[in-house]
Amino acid sequence: MKFAGIIAEYDPFHNGHAWQLAQAKALGAERVAVAMSCSLVQRGALPLLPEAVRTRSALTCGADLVFALPAPCACAGAEAFARAGVALLAAAGCDGLVFGAETPDAALLMEAAELLDSGSYRAALKAQLAGGARSFAAARQAAAAQLASDERVAALLDKPNNNLAVEYCRAIRSLAPRMEAYPLPRQGANHGEALHSAHGQFASASALRKLWAEGGADAVAPYVPEAVFPLYQEAYAAGQYTDFSAAGRCELALLRSACRDKAPFADIRGVSEGLEHRLEAAVRTSTTYDELLDALTTVRYPRARMRRLAMDAALGFTADSLPALPPYLHLLGGKKDALPFLKNCTLPVSHSLARLRGSGDASARMAEAQLAASDFGTLCRVSPEAMGGLLRQKNIFLT
C-alpha cells in the first residue's frame, strides 16, 4: 500500500483517530488521504466542530490530504456512506482503505461482503422482511446466518463497526477492486459506551461530545492529541461549535415551513412505505426535535434512519436531484509535499467549491446541496456565521 485512504467523521478528532493514522503509515503507506464528512454526519446531525478545525486536527496528526465527503453522501445509511467514501478515495488514487472493525479480519469481512452481494442473500433477506422480522438489522443477520458456511460471518454482523466494515468491503468489490482492505481493531470505548478507566486515553466520539456538552473543551483534553487541544480551546472560546438545541429547533422550523406545501415530503430521498405521511404528521404535532424523533422511531424505523430522513427533508434533499457518488474532489487541506499525489485524480479536484460547482450539472447539484447543509450548520453554532462560509473558506496547507 502506497497511498492509504480513510473514511472518517472526526466528530471530534481524538486519540483513536491519531492512532489509526499512525497505523496506516506503519502498514507502509507513504501518504494518507481522508474522506471527511462535511457539514453533516452519518447519524443525521451536524458535527460538533467546523470543517477547518477537524481538517487541521487530522493534518496535524498524520493525514496528508483531507477531502470533503459531501453532506448528502455523509448523511446516509451505511451502504451509501461507504460507497461514496470508497468512490471518492479511489478517484483520489488510493490503493488501500484503512478502517476500524470489531473483527479486524480482512478475509472474513470480504467473505461477508461477497455473501451480502449474492442473489441468494437478497432473496433470503426479502423473505425475512416479508416474514415479519423485527428490524432490517435482525433480518440481515438472520439471512446471513441461513446462508453462511462459516458461522463467524453472520456473527460479525452483530457489531456496528463490523457492519460498516462489510459495507466498505462491498464498495471495494464493486467500485475499486484493486483497492486493498486493511481493517484495524477499535481502540478503547465502543460507540455510545460510557467512559471507563480501562479505556485509558481512548474514548468514543459520542462520549466526547457528551463531555463537551457538560464541561466544554477542557473536559475532552485527556482524550485528544496534545497538538489538537489548542484548536479545540480556540473553537470553544470563539463559539465555533454546534449548539445542538438551536439546531433541533431550526430543523423543526424548516420542516414546519415545508408543511405549507401539498405533499411536502413525497420526493425526499429515503421515503418509502408511506413514511412521507408519517413524517408530515409528526412535524405537525411535535413541539421539539426530540418529540419529532420519538414520534417517528419504531423498531422497524431506527432513530438514526429517522434523523437522516428529517435532515434530508429539512434541507430538501430529493431522491432524483443528487448524484449517488461524489462528482468531484473538494480538497479541504493538505501537506504541501503531498500535493503531487493529486495529479492522478480521476475526478475534478480543487480547494474551491465555487470552481467545482461549475464543472458540470452533477457537480452543481451536489455543491448546492453541500452549501445548504453548510449554511444550516453555521447558523446553528453558538456564535452563528453568515451564509456562504464554505465558499470563502481558505484551504489549509501545512508544511
Model regions: which residues?
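A glycine-rich helix N-cap at a beta->alpha junction
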Residues: 55-70
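Secondary-structure boundary/capping positions in well-ordered alpha/beta enzyme cores
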Residues: 31-32, 65, 179
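Short, contiguous strand/loop micro-motifs
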Residues: 7-8, 41-42, 58, 72-73, ...
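Short hydrophobic/aromatic-rich motifs at helix boundaries and adjacent loops
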Residues: 26-29, 56-60, 140-141, 180-181
